[in-house]
Amino acid sequence: MIFSTLEHILTHISFSVVSIVITIHFLTLFLLVDEVVGLYDSSEKGMIVTFFCITGLLVTRWIYSGHFPLSDLYESLIFLSWGFSLIHMVSYLKFKKRKNNLSAITAPSAIFTQGFATSGLLTKMHQSAILAPALQSQWLMMHVSMMVLGYAALLCGSLLSVALLVITFRKAIKIIGENNNFSFSFGKIQYMNERSNVLLNTYFLSSKNYYRYQLTQQLDRWSYRIISLGFIFLTIGILSGAVWANEAWGSYWNWDPKETWAFITWTVFAIYFHTRTNTNLEGVNSALVASMGFLIIWICYFGVNLLGIGLHSYGSFTLN
């Protein structure tokens, strides 16, 4: 009873704090004045509080359930929210003396995942249950934690790529809207990318263009670093899952929906790294691949659970 009450308190504190953090972040975004520096510092401290609250929540659930809290969708969503908070903490410690724009990605991601986890859709999963026989293995912590941390990093990196595309093609989207022409081929994207590079070189001395150039380069660099980290986690998760599958089901790979989409996710981001090796395709083109990967991750992590079929059906749920 005590642990359940403590978990309930920590859940609501973390959700409330991260909600305040998002509000403060948007205030600092739209009120570009020196007076909001204190507000920004408060938002950073708020994310630290959120991180420790979610950590306490997971530890509490681990203690009273007797197993690592990654046995169902509710627990994995809380762990995913913790992963977003962890990424924010790492970036905060690295750029303690500078403004951390990554919070624009990590804070909304944390509140979205935790908000869904604590919603009425997953009420039946809020109470810890006895671990399913298929999950009673030492591989649970290794496999599932690596997969969820991989999802968290890949989602953050993909969202940074989406932001890069929005900044790069803001004028192009405006032109398309005015002409009511929504056909946007890859060739046009390549042409506009080359055109933007020419304009950048021509107006390099312009402070506005130079700031945009710096911002896009920073987004591209951070996206690559975070996606690289997520890809490593995803690879470790898939390999450890294959070993676990061989022990549990007698086969390293069974091509059930979860495994198939995990392989598709891995392939998409492998293509992303391939585009990074080609100087003609890096930047905007690699960001397009990463943006596509954002949707693929959600299908793999969340969409497959809606089917409720396959060897990973214990993580499914129904929208009742």
Curated annotation (Swiss-Prot):
Record GO biological process: cytochrome complex assembly
Pfam families xrefs: Cytochrom_C_asm
Keywords tagged on the record: Chloroplast, Cytochrome c-type biogenesis, Membrane, Plastid, Thylakoid, Transmembrane, Transmembrane helix
Membrane topology qualifier: Multi-pass membrane protein
Bilayer-crossing regions: 13-33, 46-66, 73-93, 102-122, 147-167, 226-246, 259-274, 289-309
GO annotations of cellular component type: chloroplast thylakoid membrane
Major location category of this protein: plastid
Gene Ontology MF annotations: heme binding
Compartmental location: Plastid, Chloroplast thylakoid membrane
NCBIfam families found in the cross-reference section: cytochr_II_ccsB
Record-stated family: Belongs to the CcmF/CycK/Ccl1/NrfE/CcsA family.
Functional note: Required during biogenesis of c-type cytochromes (cytochrome c6 and cytochrome f) at the step of heme attachment.
Assembly mode: May interact with Ccs1.
Protein name: Cytochrome c biogenesis protein CcsA
Source species of the chain: Gossypium hirsutum
Gene label: ccsA
